[in-house]
Amino acid sequence: MTLRLSRRAYAEMFGPTTGDRVRLADTDLLIEIERDFTIYGEEVKFGGGKVIRDGMGQSQRVAAEVPDTVITNAVILDHWGIVKADIAIKHGRIAAIGKAGNPDIQPGVTIPIGAGTEVIAGEGLIVTAGGIDTHIHFISPQQIDEALASGVTTMLGGGTGPATGTNATTCTPGPWHMERMLQAADGWPINLGFLGKGNASRPEPLLEQIAAGAIGLKLHEDWGTTPAAIDTCLSIADDTDTQVAIHTDTLNEAGFVESTVAAFKGRTIHTYHTEGAGGGHAPDILKVCGEANVLPSSTNPTRPYTINTLEEHLDMLMVCHHLDPSIAEDLAFAESRIRRETIAAEDILHDLGALSMLSSDSQAMGRVGEVIIRTWQTAHKMKVQRGALPEDSARNDNFRAKRYVAKYTINPAITHGIAHQVGSIEPGKWADLVLWEPAFFGIKPTMILKGGMIALAQMGDPNASIPTPQPVHYREMFATRGGALARTSLTFVSQLAADAGIAERYGLAKPIVPVRNCRQVTKADMIHNAWRPAISVDPETYDVIADGQLLTCEPASVLPMAQRYFLF
């Protein structure tokens, strides 16, 4: 006997299926389900009178043969596709993406459910991989709370707290600070990795930081990013298979952008805030987007270009870089970095895939809780101003969605050598998953899983008779407590440090995971974001030309994902 359901009735019961479209928050972006791994008429759902019951959708298999958790009927949005599926989690990792149920009585089951399986209802929800923010100034530990609540589950950067150096530069300098920060990482339910200070013209001060646990090194102009320092730093990175991030020389004191590119010598490097408002060769650091060995990213205060972007940047810059507005030279330094033309071009370079990643620059000209929001605001603004991408159809924005989600998930993971652990929803990877109601997508997650365990969720009054009464707000869950914290998050270190036994020497509780394959990465490896245009910036007008085309757009006066969702 067959029961035919309308698409609306089916979506309300089991979530959208192949051919259904979902709007992302209040944007103009629509995603369309490309494939449904579940089987019509054999879907599993938990609840009274529902399918996942003993002898029905739940099998008799023992715990070793079933997942620890199944997320049912979820819409997965990832760089590799937009699909409807059940997601299996086992031992803190994604075990399978497919069809859950009881294989003894149901056809096509790839994920058996048993008495040892917990269920999270994913019907009507979107699931993304946890975000990865690769530009963190570790100024205050409270940033971690904000980042996690936004859907970020991995933070990479440097710092030691609100020291003057950390306020300006993402560096954890020296072995002593590196050890202390790695020990501090044990107290937070998030994956962490730290960059050492890369500014030295001799190798020994750099190598000792990698040996102490740094996942890479950061070159920052405030410490002197000279060609000699760049060359030395990249040589150490090549020797240790670690990444280098760079904030180039705004003042062009030690050379122009061409001098910096020459110092790279074709070696892989991650260029922070590549547009330049966050720092870098004025006015043409954007040129490096065309280099095969350069992995370019943006920071979020210029994302997207709005009528307020320029005005807020001057004060931010003066504070972050310890400048004095009463000193003419300091003011000129600040003003040289803030250019409406290059910020406008940055929008388009993201939309066309020339800028590969997006990060925060937390408390140092960036907002740690807004990486994901600003990524999707940029995508919306570009659709409104530029229309559909050539790869998309009139029905959906699937390719654009994949391009933008890759900017804060898989591409940062590839860049920093952690893609074997995090960055996408694929079997074998750490189960850092973010669940969203479509109306709140990119803004306020419903639930965040760390290593397969619920770490943060929207939760009502704990004294109420049910979970939903007000006040509903984010509350830490059991993955953040006791010994579970250290077993649901990772600390990334160098292979050199792992081999030297720093976990035991420092007394670390979290698992340490070495970064790997950092030095072979090229722009071509940046998924959906590998375009390498020939870029020029007019030194007088700051107009940006890419492959012969002028890149310009108007600032937005209103954005989605903003006042509709927030009081402040």
Curated annotation (Swiss-Prot):
Q: Has UniProt tagged this entry with the keyword rRNA-binding?
A: no
| CDD domains, alphabetized | Urease_alpha
Record EC number: 3.5.1.5
Catalyses: urea + 2 H2O + H(+) = hydrogencarbonate + 2 NH4(+)
The Urease domain sits at: 130-568
Q: Which cofactor does it need?
A: Ni cation
- Residues where substrate binds: 220
Q: Where in the cell is it found?
A: Cytoplasm
A GO-annotated cellular component: cytoplasm
Which molecular function GO terms apply here? nickel cation binding; urease activity
Binding residues for Ni(2+) 2:
218, 247, 273
One of the GO BP terms on file: urea catabolic process
Residues modified as N6-carboxylysine are 218
What residues form the catalytic site here? 321
Q: Tell me which UniProt keywords the record has, alphabetically.
A: Cytoplasm, Hydrolase, Metal-binding, Nickel
**Post-translational modification comment from the UniProt entry:** Carboxylation allows a single lysine to coordinate two nickel ions.
Question: Where this protein primarily resides, as one coarse class?
Answer: cytoplasm
**Pathway this chain belongs to:** Nitrogen metabolism; urea degradation; CO(2) and NH(3) from urea (urease route): step 1/1
Q: How is the cofactor bound?
A: Binds 2 nickel ions per subunit.
| Record: residues binding Ni(2+) 1 | 135, 137, 218, 361
Q: Which HAMAP family match?
A: Urease_alpha
Subunit structure, interactors included: Heterotrimer of UreA (gamma), UreB (beta) and UreC (alpha) subunits. Three heterotrimers associate to form the active enzyme.
Family per UniProt? Belongs to the metallo-dependent hydrolases superfamily. Urease alpha subunit family.
What protein am I looking at? Urease subunit alpha
* Source species of the chain: Burkholderia multivorans (strain ATCC 17616 / 249)
